[in-house]
Every structure is written in structure tokens, then in C-alpha cells.
Design a protein with these regions (language model features):
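Feature marks short, surface-exposed loop/turn motifs that line or immediately flank catalytic pockets
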Residues: 16, 57-59, 121
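Nucleic-acid nuclease catalytic cores
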Residues: 138-164
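Surface-exposed cleft-lining segments at the edges of enzyme active sites
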Residues: 21-27, 87, 117-121
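Conserved catalytic cores of phosphodiester-cleaving nucleases, focusing on short active-site segments
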Residues: 98-104, 111-121, 133
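Mg2+/Mn2+-dependent nuclease catalytic core
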Residues: 120-138
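A general structural signal for alpha-helical elements within enzymatic catalytic domains
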Residues: 43-47, 138
Length: 165
């Protein structure tokens, strides 16, 4: 699928989110609530794919990042962030839970898009989310595209940073 088609579909979903769920953005519910609603709209636009939130599997294994320390973001520093999504199982790898993914379950060659979301009111963990996107676009996961999405709260504009492979 072409990146421009994907961008148009995601933009449309963000418009629907604003139209139907502005109240959630106004009261600043947690990011998981927002990503769940957004994923519902994304699923409608990608009917031939599975759209999952907080999905931590790669085939039968747990989805992990092993080489992030070698990519200029020290894992020990990440522990200082209060990032709820991390499970520190050992010092060399960590279990990750991408906010939204568009993929085909049990088909690792069909990983289309990983989306990491932050509310505009949340400035913590952006560097980690971007590194997570970059890592998941590499083997073995090989997502074709990545998106870091800063959701505008209380009528602020959304900001999208796209990552092509």
C-alpha cells in the first residue's frame, strides 16, 4: 500500500476521532482510551488488515527490543521515565507494547504501520516512542511505515511525524 494512501486514511480517521470523540480530548482521558477509539476508526479504513492496540506478540514470541542500547538511547535512562508500557524483564531486552499497529496476525511479512501516540499535554517518553518505531521497522518486525502522532488536546492541531522504511 502506498504511503500517501495510508496518510489520507489516517488523516480521515483523525477527523472522525475529532467529530465523534472531542469530549474525550477535552477532558484529557488517558492515551490508551484515545488510541483505542482511533484504532476502531482505523480498522474501518483497513478492512484487510488487523488493527491492534498494545499488541506485544511477534508470531508466538513476546515483542522485544534488544538493540536499543546500541542505538543511542540507554535503557538504564529509560527507567527514569515513568512509562507504564514497559516491563523490564532483563537488562538487555524489554517487552514493548506499541500503541496501535496495522498488520496481519501470524504473517510477519505484512506488518504495515506502527503508530505511537502522545497527547499534546504529555512531554514524557517521546524519544523512546520514536526509537521504538525505528526499531520495529527493522528486522525481524519490518514494519513498512511508522507514525509518531501527537494528538492535539482541546482543539490543538495534531502533529504527525512519518517514518518510511
Amino acid at each position: 500500500m502506498d504511503i500517501d494512501v495510508i496518510k489520507d486514511k489516517i488523516e480521515y480517521c483523525l477527523q472522525i476521532l475529532r467529530e465523534k470523540d472531542q469530549d474525550l480530548l477535552d477532558i484529557e482521558v488517558n492515551e490508551r482510551t484515545i488510541t483505542h477509539k482511533l484504532a476502531e476508526y482505523i480498522q474501518d479504513q483497513f478492512p484487510n488488515y488487523d488493527v491492534d492496540c498494545e499488541y506485544n506478540r511477534y508470531e508466538k514470541d513476546t515483542k522485544r527490543i534488544r538493540s536499543i542500547k546500541n542505538r543511542s538511547l540507554d535503557i538504564t535512562k529509560l527507567k527514569k521515565y515513568q512509562i507504564e508500557k514497559l516491563i523490564w524483564e532483563d537488562k538487555k531486552a524489554l517487552t514493548i507494547y506499541p500503541d496501535i499497529i496495522i498488520h496481519k496476525r501470524k504473517s510477519p511479512n505484512n506488518n504495515l504501520l506502527i503508530i505511537e501516540v502522545k497527547k499534546s499535554s504529555n512531554n514524557k517518553g517521546e524519544d523512546f516512542d520514536i526509537k521504538k518505531i525505528e526499531e520495529l521497522m527493522e528486522p525481524p518486525y519490518k514494519y513498512k511505515f511508522g507514525l509518531f502522532l501527537r494528538i492535539g488536546i482541546q482543539n490543538e492541531n495534531n502533529k504527525c511525524k512519518w517514518f518510511p522504511r
